């Protein structure tokens, strides 16, 4: 009677080893895809079109040099400027011929969503922390793909000198797809 169990024991051990090996192979592939997607998409997040509003300061920044906003503009209690000088005072629904950028919901990201001063790992951890990002992974994909203020970065108009503003280093579609791949594969963060 012990003979069948002696035959089955190595087979069961091999099956367990195969299952573990398959799991180990699958997980790193997902992790690699996620990390590769994040490594590419973070170039957009670190671009001035995003960082100027995801600032850790009490004021917005502007331009590729990320200078303090003209006219002493401040963040304000709701991230829309101060009661005396709301963002919408100058920033209308569309880019203005004068060079003032526009969007119907122009505002700063909340301080909990500030990326300024963070390295790539810190940005990733901030994005994946629902308490700080205030978004689920699904909401983050939606935000990065469809929010008109995010998409403004690819249609930034001209600056105050009449020169075209620099766009992020890839298309909005490519960025959105990278965000999807990153989240679908576990939203992994670099070490």
Could you tell me what each predicted segment is?
Residues 1-42, 62, 73-78, 95-191:
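N-terminal export/targeting leaders of redox proteins
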Residues 48-57, 84-94, 179:
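The canonical Cys-X-X-Cys-His
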Residues 46-80:
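N-terminal, post-signal-peptide region of Sec/Tat-exported proteins
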Residues 36, 48, 82-85, 174:
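Short, well-structured alpha-helical interface segments that form or flank functional binding sites
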């Amino acid at each position: 009677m012990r003979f069948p169990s002696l035959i089955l024991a190595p087979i069961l051990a091999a099956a367990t080893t195969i299952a573990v090996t398959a799991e180990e192979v699958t997980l790193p592939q997902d992790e690699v895809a996620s990390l590769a997607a994040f490594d590419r998409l973070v170039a957009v997040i670190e671009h001035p079109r995003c960082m100027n509003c995801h600032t850790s300061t009490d004021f917005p920044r502007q331009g590729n040099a990320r200078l303090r906003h003209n006219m002493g503009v401040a963040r304000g209690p709701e991230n829309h400027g101060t009661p005396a000088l709301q963002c919408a005072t100058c920033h209308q629904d569309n880019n203005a011929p004068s060079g003032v950028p526009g969007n119907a919901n122009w505002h700063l990201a909340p301080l909990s969503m500030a990326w300024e001063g963070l390295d790539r790992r810190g940005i990733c951890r901030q994005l994946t922390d629902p308490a700080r990002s205030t978004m689920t992974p699904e909401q983050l994909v939606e935000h990065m793909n469809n929010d008109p203020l995010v998409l403004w970065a690819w249609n930034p108009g001209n600056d105050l000198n009449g020169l075209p503003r620099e766009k992020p280093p890839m298309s909005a579609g490519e960025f959105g797809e990278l965000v999807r791949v990153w989240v679908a594969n576990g939203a992994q963060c670099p070490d």
